[in-house]
Curated annotation (Swiss-Prot):
It catalyses: 2-C-methyl-D-erythritol 4-phosphate + CTP + H(+) = 4-CDP-2-C-methyl-D-erythritol + diphosphate. It comes from Acaryochloris marina (strain MBIC 11017). Belongs to the IspD/TarI cytidylyltransferase family. IspD subfamily. It holds the Pfam family IspD. One of its GO terms (molecular function) is 2-C-methyl-D-erythritol 4-phosphate cytidylyltransferase activity. The record marks R152, K208 as: Positions MEP for the nucleophilic attack. Its EC number is 2.7.7.60. Gene3D superfamilies: Spore Coat Polysaccharide Biosynthesis Protein SpsA, Chain A. This is 2-C-methyl-D-erythritol 4-phosphate cytidylyltransferase. It comes from the Bacteria. Pathway: Isoprenoid biosynthesis; isopentenyl diphosphate biosynthesis via DXP pathway; isopentenyl diphosphate from 1-deoxy-D-xylulose 5-phosphate: step 2/6. It is an enzyme of class 2 (transferase). Catalyzes the formation of 4-diphosphocytidyl-2-C-methyl-D-erythritol from CTP and 2-C-methyl-D-erythritol 4-phosphate (MEP).
Length: 237
């Protein structure tokens, strides 16, 4: 399975002017934990890091430190996540038939989640890892007056990985560029073309590290995970 990792996000909500994936989590950059999960995944065989050129030396140093056994390539990103994933798709090896796309900021995803998602592509054209929404959601207007309350049983919070068959995803991206569509994830492109996208159950701990509070929570989760795995080898040891 081929894995693309968009890794160009800035840390403005972290109060930082640099790539947030360079921030440290338990002694390693955020991106390191994503890469270690991919390394420990049974299914992942190829990894593409999509980032800005200014970060390439940092990621090269990180890769030398981690000494991963799987091939990892650097792919120059675009101005938006959508453009970056498009560039990533063009850089896939010719034999790639399926792809997982996983945000580098979701650095607590486990190898088991990656494997479960890879297996889902035996059955689906496209899918999104997601978890059921726990909170009651309110729809509001521009004045913050509540307009409605959706049925919570039908609401899922989208995560990554998202996975797709490569050929239809490339077609979706090409049409999106032609039509000028701007979307926040790849599943939305599938949806615009009425292609089926399914849900694969994600992980509650698979949070996206965006704010200082997220980073603090991630530290606690990772510390517990490391303690639990302290007697084993592999991811998290």
């Amino acid at each position: 399975m081929h894995l693309l990792i968009p890794a160009a996000g800035m840390g403005r909500r972290m109060g930082s002017d640099r790539n947030k994936l360079r921030l440290m989590l338990h002694g390693k950059p955020l991106l390191a934990w994503t890469l270690l999960a991919a390394e420990s995944s049974i299914s992942i065989s190829w990894i593409g890091i999509i980032g800005q050129l200014e970060d390439e030396p940092t990621w090269e140093t990180l890769l030398n430190t981690l000494s991963l056994n799987k091939p990892v390539v650097f792919i120059e990103g675009g101005q938006t996540r959508q453009e970056s994933v498009y560039n990533g798709l063009q850089a896939l090896p010719p034999e790639a038939e399926q792809v997982l796309i996983h945000d580098g900021a979701r650095c607590l995803a486990t190898p088991e989640l990656l494997d479960r998602c890879a297996h889902a592509l035996h059955k689906y054209q496209g899918f999104v890892a997601a978890v059921p929404v726990k909170d009651t959601i309110k729809v509001v207007d521009t004045t913050h007056q509540i307009q409605g309350t959706p049925d919570r049983s039908q609401l899922w919070a989208a995560q990554t990985p998202q996975g797709f068959q490569v050929v239809p995803l490339k077609k979706c991206h090409e049409q999106g560029r032609q039509q000028g569509w701007e979307v926040t994830d790849d599943a939305a492109l599938f949806e615009k073309l009425d292609l089926p996208v399914h849900i694969v159950v994600g992980e509650e701990t698979n949070l996206k590290v965006t704010t200082p509070a997220d980073l603090a929570i991630a530290e606690l989760i990772l510390e517990q995970r490391l303690q639990k795995n302290s007697q084993t080898d592999g991811f998290g040891s």
